[in-house]
């Protein structure tokens, strides 16, 4: 297992080499105890560390809550005109987390996951639901391959603020790119102002 500094240096070098933003999921030791932290870490195209989000909902059915320290706050980062909020795997099942980010101005969610094939229909449905109810872009990034317990079928995708799937990937490792229309978020929120009815 790589030490945090090694993982961060690796990700920083990728962002510099390809001149891209990098948002990646990593597991790192917790400085205060024997547990670990599940993080989404963000680097800009110059390789600079921008920040990290710590998973707020460890996956209790598999005992993550016994070995991973629970995050205490949401995070939103300004990236290329968007307010990006990272989400980690099981977090996707908790709509209140998304709403907390919406209150902070989020309009783009990136969900990094190890979502097994046996529940892939949940993955599809929840990604679309989070996009629709928050009138935001949702990018779902899921692993492929297998481990001793599960097969993983990928199915990474991008859902726009209206709930339309604008990009879908299959069950193998792939790299793809597309453009997101920042104006679509504002246009749809103005046309159908659901978020104005959120109650405190």
Residue ranges and their predicted role:
Residues 42-44, 159-160, 178-180:
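Short beta-strand-to-turn element immediately C-terminal to the catalytic PLP-Schiff-base lysine
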Residues 2-24, 93-176:
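CN hydrolase (nitrilase-like) catalytic-core segments centered on the catalytic cysteine
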Residues 19-20, 58, 136, 193, ...:
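Generic structural signal for secondary-structure transition and capping sites
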Residues 9, 13, 31-104, 117-125, ...:
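Active-site catalytic loop in hydrolytic enzyme cores
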């Amino acid at each position: 297992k790589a030490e945090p500094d090694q993982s961060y240096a690796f990700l920083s070098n990728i962002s510099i080499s390809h001149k891209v933003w990098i948002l990646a999921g990593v597991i790192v030791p917790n400085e205060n105890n024997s547990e670990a932290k599940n993080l989404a870490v963000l680097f800009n195209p110059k390789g600079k560390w921008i920040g990290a989000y710590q998973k707020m909902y460890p996956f209790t059915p598999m005992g993550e809550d016994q070995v991973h320290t629970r995050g205490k706050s949401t995070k939103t980062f300004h990236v290329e005109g968007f307010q990006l909020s990272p989400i980690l795997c099981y977090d996707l099942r908790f709509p209140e987390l998304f709403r907390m980010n919406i209150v902070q101005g989020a309009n783009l969610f990136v969900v990094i996951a190890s979502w097994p094939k046996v529940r892939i229909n949940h993955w599809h449905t929840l990604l679309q639901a989070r996009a629709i109810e928050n009138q935001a872009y949702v990018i779902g990034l899921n692993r492929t391959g297998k481990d001793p317990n599960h097969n993983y079928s990928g199915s990474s995708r991008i859902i726009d603020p209206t709930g339309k799937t604008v990009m879908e990937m299959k069950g193998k490792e792939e790299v793809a790119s597309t453009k997101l229309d920042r104006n679509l978020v504002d246009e749809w929120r103005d046309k159908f102002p659901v978020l104005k009815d959120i109650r405190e």
